[in-house]
């Protein structure tokens, strides 16, 4: 008799996705981040659910309710910090996952890649709205500054911003709708992740060489289930170390001051995982230009399959491209650092140079390097 996991309508789906899935035999630890992102999402939904049980989305009580969670709710402090630092872990995994895709040419799976870019945007939107909820100083002013960027859109900008705010400034209406959206978005992300996986399983996974691995496949279970469990344990170890030893390491001290519309903090900045984009935004003196650069800094990922000029898929055997890739990583780290610095000399010029370098690397230098490498193959 055939095993129930192969015949039952629901178990069959699970079986084909996580048990009998043919996987390349040579995928490295860089392929662990997909499952880690799934774990992060589940963790965020669960901790978020318990936080929502005690949180009140009202300008007068939001800050107090978060304090109440940390002081009075049983293990509320650990739930709150797991949620806040879980977001940081989520973005670390996201950046690693995207970086892996860029390095090994995974973007040639167009549908999977484009759903992934949509997932990245959705996650960034969710994290931004979540940051507003504690209603501290940085929550309020971050929400004001970032939503205000939409006013740069010609003709409809101002109306659009006031429509999002639900009034003439960030207020009660803004907070309640942000809470509603912050609650629903993770479920949309989960649905999109399933579509992401569906498209991936149409083609099968890529591998470090970028060459078809059809001739050498192994079952997902037990090989990669064990490997994913190891990854998950390391993720939880890092997360819990952060939560239990320095929970506020990645946060902003300003967010421990209740929101005050009459007092602007000296340096308004978003969470660390948005700083690279924030630096690109600030490096352009024009408001609309800055907003466009901000959106393009992420949207440029959609162009990756079109910018792929190499005859090889992966960068594994392309030393010049490898060099440029790591320069791009260094550039993004520089932008992240600049995003957290005040707008003054020499940070302004460093930010502008790093922003130019970012677009130059992706749009010009990397495609050029690929073409040079193609010609080197003839020698």
From Swiss-Prot:
<feature type="transmembrane region" description="Helical">
    <location>
        <begin position="288"/>
        <end position="308"/>
    </location>
</feature>
<dbReference type="Pfam" id="PF00032">
    <property type="entry name" value="Cytochrom_B_C"/>
</dbReference>
<dbReference type="InterPro" id="IPR048260">
    <property type="entry name" value="Cytochrome_b_C_euk/bac"/>
</dbReference>
<dbReference type="InterPro" id="IPR048259">
    <property type="entry name" value="Cytochrome_b_N_euk/bac"/>
</dbReference>
<dbReference type="Pfam" id="PF00033">
    <property type="entry name" value="Cytochrome_B"/>
</dbReference>
<dbReference type="InterPro" id="IPR027387">
    <property type="entry name" value="Cytb/b6-like_sf"/>
</dbReference>
<dbReference type="GO" id="GO:0005743">
    <property type="term" value="C:mitochondrial inner membrane"/>
</dbReference>
<feature type="transmembrane region" description="Helical">
    <location>
        <begin position="320"/>
        <end position="340"/>
    </location>
</feature>
<comment type="similarity">
    <text>Belongs to the cytochrome b family.</text>
</comment>
<keyword id="KW-1133">Transmembrane helix</keyword>
<keyword id="KW-0999">Mitochondrion inner membrane</keyword>
<dbReference type="GO" id="GO:0046872">
    <property type="term" value="F:metal ion binding"/>
</dbReference>
<dbReference type="InterPro" id="IPR005797">
    <property type="entry name" value="Cyt_b/b6_N"/>
</dbReference>
<feature type="transmembrane region" description="Helical">
    <location>
        <begin position="178"/>
        <end position="198"/>
    </location>
</feature>
<dbReference type="InterPro" id="IPR030689">
    <property type="entry name" value="Cytochrome_b"/>
</dbReference>
<dbReference type="InterPro" id="IPR016174">
    <property type="entry name" value="Di-haem_cyt_TM"/>
</dbReference>
<feature type="binding site" description="axial binding residue">
    <location>
        <position position="182"/>
    </location>
    <ligand>
        <name>heme b b562</name>
    </ligand>
</feature>
<dbReference type="GO" id="GO:0045275">
    <property type="term" value="C:respiratory chain complex III"/>
</dbReference>
<dbReference type="GO" id="GO:0008121">
    <property type="term" value="F:ubiquinol-cytochrome-c reductase activity"/>
</dbReference>
<feature type="transmembrane region" description="Helical">
    <location>
        <begin position="77"/>
        <end position="98"/>
    </location>
</feature>
<keyword id="KW-0408">Iron</keyword>
<dbReference type="GO" id="GO:0006122">
    <property type="term" value="P:mitochondrial electron transport, ubiquinol to cytochrome c"/>
</dbReference>
<comment type="subunit">
    <text>The cytochrome bc1 complex contains 11 subunits: 3 respiratory subunits (MT-CYB, CYC1 and UQCRFS1), 2 core proteins (UQCRC1 and UQCRC2) and 6 low-molecular weight proteins (UQCRH/QCR6, UQCRB/QCR7, UQCRQ/QCR8, UQCR10/QCR9, UQCR11/QCR10 and a cleavage product of UQCRFS1). This cytochrome bc1 complex then forms a dimer.</text>
</comment>
<keyword id="KW-0830">Ubiquinone</keyword>
<comment type="function">
    <text>Component of the ubiquinol-cytochrome c reductase complex (complex III or cytochrome b-c1 complex) that is part of the mitochondrial respiratory chain. The b-c1 complex mediates electron transfer from ubiquinol to cytochrome c. Contributes to the generation of a proton gradient across the mitochondrial membrane that is then used for ATP synthesis.</text>
</comment>
<keyword id="KW-0813">Transport</keyword>
<dbReference type="InterPro" id="IPR036150">
    <property type="entry name" value="Cyt_b/b6_C_sf"/>
</dbReference>
<keyword id="KW-0496">Mitochondrion</keyword>
<keyword id="KW-0679">Respiratory chain</keyword>
<keyword id="KW-0472">Membrane</keyword>
<feature type="transmembrane region" description="Helical">
    <location>
        <begin position="347"/>
        <end position="367"/>
    </location>
</feature>
<feature type="binding site" description="axial binding residue">
    <location>
        <position position="83"/>
    </location>
    <ligand>
        <name>heme b b562</name>
    </ligand>
</feature>
<keyword id="KW-0349">Heme</keyword>
<feature type="binding site">
    <location>
        <position position="201"/>
    </location>
    <ligand>
        <name>a ubiquinone</name>
    </ligand>
</feature>
<keyword id="KW-0479">Metal-binding</keyword>
<dbReference type="InterPro" id="IPR005798">
    <property type="entry name" value="Cyt_b/b6_C"/>
</dbReference>
<keyword id="KW-0812">Transmembrane</keyword>
<protein>
    <recommendedName>
        <fullName>Cytochrome b</fullName>
    </recommendedName>
</protein>
<feature type="binding site" description="axial binding residue">
    <location>
        <position position="97"/>
    </location>
    <ligand>
        <name>heme b b566</name>
    </ligand>
</feature>
<feature type="transmembrane region" description="Helical">
    <location>
        <begin position="226"/>
        <end position="246"/>
    </location>
</feature>
<feature type="binding site" description="axial binding residue">
    <location>
        <position position="196"/>
    </location>
    <ligand>
        <name>heme b b566</name>
    </ligand>
</feature>
<feature type="transmembrane region" description="Helical">
    <location>
        <begin position="113"/>
        <end position="133"/>
    </location>
</feature>
